[in-house]
Amino acid sequence: MSFLKKSLLLILFLGLVSLSVCKEEKRVSEEENENEENHEEGSEMKRYAFGYPSGEAKKIKRESEEEKEIEENHEEGSEMKRYAFGYPSGEAKKIKRESEEENENEENHEEGSEMKRYAFGYPSGEAKKIKRESEEEKEIEENHEEGSEMKRYAFGYPSGEAKKIKRESEEENENEENHEEGSEMKRYAFGYPSGEAK
């Protein structure tokens, strides 16, 4: 009986001790929380006084940076997908659009210039180009003929002009011979003496 009594008293004593310890811990914890809150309020007031961002402002800034980072990662992912599937990137689209705008401006400028030329009777760019190409072809042909003429002269061949003169001379001789043969045949047919018999 006394053992049971002692055991109950011991349990009761330990319960009271643990209860007081819990109360003390709770009180200390509450004091720490209060001190921390006071410290935070003081820090907040200091930040406000000296223009530093508050904890809330820091949180907002951090969230904004995280959103920005997520957006950049999304753009990088999209860029990689476009690259993988051969679609132009935002930058490439911008460059292409600028290039198309420049081409369009250039075409409009050329059309305007063409209209001015037409109005004032100047040859167009296309007409100038055709004229220039024609002149270049003519010049090339002349240079080729000069080169051929020099080769003929160097190797003793007659030039195109000399060939033409020679050919005309040969044709005249042939015509003359044919004429003489015809006259000879007429004389013979009508019994006149030929130039040879005369």
Swiss-Prot record:
Annotated tissue distribution: Expressed by the skin glands.
Biased composition (Basic and acidic residues): 56-65, 126-135
Modified residues (Serine amide): S54, S89, S124, S159, S194
GO terms of biological process kind: defense response; neuropeptide signaling pathway
Prosequence residues removed at maturation: 21-45, 56-80, 91-115, 126-150, 161-185, 196-198
A GO cellular component entry from the record: extracellular region
Keywords: Amidation, Amphibian defense peptide, Cleavage on pair of basic residues, D-amino acid, Endorphin, Opioid peptide, Repeat, Secreted, Signal
Recorded GO MF terms: opioid peptide activity
InterPro entries: Frog_antimicrobial_propeptide
Domain of life (superkingdom): Eukaryota
Signal sequence residues: 1-20
Keyword Signal among record annotations: yes
Subcellular location: Secreted
Keyword Cell membrane part of the UniProt annotation: no
Modified residues (D-alanine (Ala)): A49, A84, A119, A154, A189
Region (Disordered): 24-198
Function: Dermorphin has a very potent opiate-like activity. It has high affinity and selectivity for mu-type opioid receptors.
Family named by the database record: Belongs to the frog skin active peptide (FSAP) family. Dermorphin subfamily.
Protein name: Dermorphin-2
Organism: Phyllomedusa sauvagei
Lineage: Eukaryota, Metazoa, Chordata, Craniata, Vertebrata
